[in-house]
Amino acid sequence: MNSNFNQHFERIKELRALLNKANYSYYVLDSPEIDDSVYDQLYRELIEIENIHPSLITDDSPSQRLGGVPSKGFKNVEHNIPLLSLDNAFNLNEVEAWYGRISKLISSENKNIKKVYDPELICELKIDGNAISLRYENGILTRATTRGDGKTGEDITTNIRTISTIPLRLLLENPPLWVEIRGEAFMPNNIFNKLNIERKNNDQPLFANPRNSCAGTLRQLDPKIVASRKLDFFAYSLYFPENWEPTDNNFKKPISQSESLEFLKNIGFKVNTTYETTKTLNEANKYYKYWEVKKDFLAYATDGIVVKIDKFEIQNLLGATNKAPRWAIAVKYPAEEKATKLRKIIFQVGRSGAVTPVAEFESIELAGTSVNRATLHNAKRLASLDLHYEDTIIVRKAGEIIPEVIRVIKEFRKVDAKLVQLPQNCPECNSKLILESNEAITKCINYRCAAKLKGLLRHWVSKGSMNIDGLGEKIINQLVNEGYVKSIADLYKLEIDSLLELERFGEKSANNLLIEINESKNKNWHKQLYGLGIPHIGEANAKSLSNNFNSIEELNAIAKESPEKISNIYGFGNEMKDAIVKWFDDSNNQTLIKELKAIGFSLKESLDSNYNSNQSNVFDGKSFVLTGTLDSLTRDEAKELIESAGGKVSSSISKKTDFLVSGEKAGSKLNKAQELGVKIINENELKLLL
C-alpha cells in the first residue's frame, strides 16, 4: 500500500508539472505544446489519483481552479504593501508638467547629478479593469485581494484561482519566502459581448461595461460562476524581500520596470507586451497618440496609458505621497466624439406612460463598438439641443459606456430643416399626451395603451416580482399584439389553445408556462406589491410598505385617509407618498386590484408569515450594518430578516447607524463602530431583538 501511495505521490507531482507547463504555454505564451485531448487525459488522471488520495490535494493543484462550495461572503484583509492609485493627467501638457517636476526633484535629491536629470521612461497601456494583489508564499498562491481603499481590500482568493492566466505555483526554483504581484483583472471584450447577449436572451439587466462586469464577477459568491465568465489578468509589478537573489541561472533580479515585466512573464504570468521604453518625453507622447487611435482594435478595454520611471533606483528616490507614487502618472484618453447625421427621432413609451425621445443616426464606431442610436431622455433635453431633422450631430460615449448626443453643428443645417418636436399624441395608441408639471416628462395616460401594458407585464413577471422565467419579452409582445392579454389579470386566464397559436409553443412548453403562471399567485405580499408597478416604489420600498401595511386594503385606506403615515415611513418622502396616493386614485388600478383578488391573489401578508403585525415593525426606522461571518445566517439571510422587520441594511458605518451586527473575523467596520459609539450586537442578540 505504501508502495502504491509513493508511486501516486511521484506521479501526481509529474502530472501537476506537466499541466502547469501546458497552461503556461497555452494561456501566457499563446503557444500550445500539447493537444487538448492529451491535456484532458492528463487532467483526468490527476483527478483520479486525487480522488484515491485526498490528502495529496494541494492549493497549487490544477484541479483546484474551479473552486468548491459558494462562499458566504468576503472578509477584509490588510495589504502588506499599500496598493496605491495613480495621479491622473488629462492632456499632454499635464504630463510635461509632471515630467519637469520629477526631473528637478531627482536632481535635488541626488547630489551627484550636476544638471537637471532626464530619466528613462516606460510606457504601458492602462487596462480598464480591476486592480488585484496576489501574495505567493514559497512560490504558492496563498491570497488574492482587491484594491479596496489601498490599505485594506477584500479576500477573493477562491475566485482568483479560476483565472487561467494566474499561476497557482510560480515557475521559479527556490522562490523567496514571499512575493507580491500586482496586476489588473479584466473581462475581454468578446466575453463581455457574449455575456450580455445571454443576459438579454434571459431578460436580465445588461452589464454597462467590461470593467463593471469584471468587478461584479469577482464579487460572486459562487466560484463556478466566476470560472464560467473567463476573466483574464495582466501582471504589471512585483515586490519581494530585498535580500532575495534567484538561484536559477536563467533568472536575474530585476532592477527596472521593463526587466520586471520580463521576469513576471518568465515565472508564469501573462503581461501586456505593448509596453515601450523611451528616452524622451516626446517618444512617450508618440506612444500615447498611437494607442489613442489603435485602442479600439484591442481585445480588451483601455482608458489611457501609464508613464513610469523605468529604473527602480530612481523610483525609490522619488518615493510616494499617501495616495500615489511620484514616479508614475496615468494619462487618460479624452472621451471619443464623432460627427454623424441624424436620421430620425423615435418616441418610446414606458410602463408608466413616460415618452422618451431616442435619436437614430448613421452608424459610427465609438470606443470599439458600432453605435446608431442614443436616448435624449426627456422633453427638456430635446428642447435644449434644438434638434432639426437631418442635422449633423456630435455623439460621444459618456464614461466610455453610454452614447449621448452632446451638440448640433448648426453650420451644416439645411435651410428648410424641420424642428424635432414632441408628438401631441401617443405614438403607440394615439391618445392625447400630457406634459407633467415639471415640464420634462411627457406621458400617455391611456391605461389600455399597448406599450404601457407590455412594460407593466415585463415588470410583473420580473425576478423581483412574480419571477415567471417562461414569459420573456417576445412572448409578452405576442400575447398583447394578438389580444390575448389586456391586463395583468388576463395572464392568469390564459388557456393552452391560445398559447399553442403563438410561435415556438408546443403542448409541453405551453403547459409548463401555465403551471409557472399559476404558481406565482403564492408569492409574498411585498413581491405582489412591487409587481403592481407603482412609480418610485422599488423592491426595498415595497418591502417597507408591506412591513407597515398588512394588505392592499389597508394601504388603500391609508392613501385615502392618512397619507402622511406613508411619508413618515423611514426612507420615504412626499414624492413616494404622492405617487402612491395618485396610483390608488386611478379607477383602473382599483379595477386591477379587484381582478387580481378574484383570480386568487391575496394581496396581503400571509398567515404563516414569520412575524405578526406587531413584531414586523420592531426595527422600523432602524439602520443596520453587517460585518464578519455570522454563526448560522448568511449575510443575505440576515438582511432579509432585518428588512422584513422594518429595518434598513447599509453597506457602510456612519453616525446614523443604529446597530452593527458583528460576526467572526469582523473587519474595519467593527473599529469604526466602536469609534462612533454604534451599538454592536451578535447574531444571537439580533434574534432576541426579533
Swiss-Prot record:
Name the UniProt record assigns to this protein: DNA ligase
UniProt source species: Prochlorococcus marinus (strain NATL2A)
NCBIfam families for the chain: dnlj, PRK07956.1
Keyword Metal-binding applies: yes
Taxonomic superkingdom: Bacteria
Gene, per the UniProt record: ligA
Gene3D superfamilies in alphabetical order: 5' to 3' exonuclease, C-terminal subdomain (1.10.150.20), 6.20.10.30, BRCT domain (3.40.50.10190), DNA ligase/mRNA capping enzyme (3.30.470.30), Helix hairpin bin (1.10.287.610), Nucleic acid-binding proteins (2.40.50.140)
Pfam family, one: BRCT
Broad enzyme group: ligase
Domain BRCT: 614-690
Amino acids binding NAD(+): 36-40, 85-86, 124, 147, 184, 308, 332
Cofactors demanded by this protein: Mg(2+); Mn(2+)
Positions annotated to bind Zn(2+): 426, 429, 444, 449
